[in-house]
Amino acid sequence: MIRFESVSVTYDGAAEPTVRGIDFEVPEGELVLLAGPSGVGKSTVLGAVSGLVPHFTGGTLAGRVTVAGRDTRTHKPRELADVVGTVGQDPLSHFVTDTVEDELAYGMESLGLPPDVMRRRVEETLDLLGLAPLRDRPLATLSGGQQQRVAIGSVLTPHPRVLVLDEPTSALDPAAAEEVLAVVQRLVHDLGTTVLMAEHRLERVVQYADRIALLPAPGAPLVVGAPDEVMAVSPVCPPVVELGRLAGWTPLPLTVRDARRRAEPLRERLAEHAGDGRPGAGAGDAGDGRPGAGAGDAGSGDSGLGVGERAGTGPAVAGATPAPPAKTPPHTSAGWTRRLFGRASRRAATEAPAESAPVAEVTGLGVRRGRVEALRRVDLALSPGETVALMGRNGAGKSTLLGSLVGLVRPTSGTVRVGGVVPYRTPPQELVRRVGLVPQEPRDLLYAETVAAECAAADRDAEAAPGTCRALVGELLPGVADGTHPRDLSEGQRLALALAVVLAARPPLVLLDEPTRGLDYAAKARLITHLRALARDGRTIVLATHDVELAAELADRVVLLAEGEVIADGPTADVVVSSPSFAPQVTKILAPQPWLTVAQVREALR
């Protein structure tokens, strides 16, 4: 169905091809996962299938790509539209109508399908993707995850023979992601649809793939094979695979179910390490009650997930200024969670000195948007040096809460104070030194034509020393040239640049909306390392995320939202271990022991 024959793509002005010598075939009715680190050319390969490369992007395509026998060099994207449906990383760029129902129907209208067929398929898609309650909603009022589901639905309704999906679950909550992937799998198995998908969150998708096509590095040869074979040599892998490597399991498990079947001996070994109060105690332990504290600083050599230095603990961080006093591990035996992780976050709130005032306080916050009550009676206090993950379903109110903290959203009721001021009443030039937001769409912050110009503008706006932003870019995004245009960066690279722009002003409160969207595991590990350093300096970090692995690695505290209300607020381990939707893979595999990360397990087994 899809055939690549010695394909190389070189963009205008580039010295080297973005991808080189791609040669493989995707048969009809097969789901192939395209994997690899950020920036290796996955989106370029996908674009070559739809004809966007080179007809829209420019550049030179050498070799040949055929889809259902049509050569994409001689067929423009509109001539492939009846065969190929494409969902890119940015759902907004796909929308051409104003409401959900109209968007689902638009592709079928363009193909001239009869009205009765269109009506039936729209209803089917609304039900399949859980969009029925949103059918009349304006697209601009939807959350990022809801927009992503609409974008996927809009390419499903014309029933294309080939689906090209670029990060299709990046903005979806875990439950919604499973629903969408189940629909895609059903199309493959029942209708023979051919799917080529790129996705960084391999823990969500690897079990659905018939084969994996791995781009291990820029310009490197493509590696194609069965999922377990490719994962054995891949530089990027999900936690279940990394845990399998650590435990020496062969073949490597790809699902939580497979891993649990083999995990009993590992659980028994780990149970021996629980008596001292927390997982990961021992080498590198700082003695302050943090799991595996110090392991990340020692450089354990983790290739993907980073080190669980602070996972599941309270807001106290060694060296933070100001910060709650150091914690001592609990010595009770009242259950695994308390023994292993303690109740540090709750204690820290009462033990903090009086002068350590909250960085931000939200009291009785309510936000109404038309008929939708986005937030209801939300109370939240954020302490210096604390890392908080806001989690919940798409549309739960996470982005609205972040918008309230940064002054983009005016409360309908209640109060919001950040650094002693009311955000929506504070001039932007003053507020930028108190709070910074990296939005879901990083392009909203990027206006210059080069990385260097973007960094120079950020330094001027923040009144920071020249080179401040560029140094941050070097840490978060190594290897990117000053003359690179932000639009030529991958989604993950643009996010890293936007984060550097925000951090140039050194705000004490840093807000990030879906910060790992588009990031591979190595880039996520670099982000975690940098955010930990900010927390050690006393900055408060608030993440709105669907990435349960990020929350397990980084967050001291998790706040769960549902229908605009806070339904849970506590230490990471206490909240996520008991949640079937928001528990990380390691927790599910090793339950009832509440380990959160591979790094904690590795540290315990030393």
Segments the model singles out, each with a brief description of its role:
Residues 155-156, 503:
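ABC ATPase C-loop
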Residues 199-200, 545-546:
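H-loop/switch region of ABC-family ATPase nucleotide-binding domains
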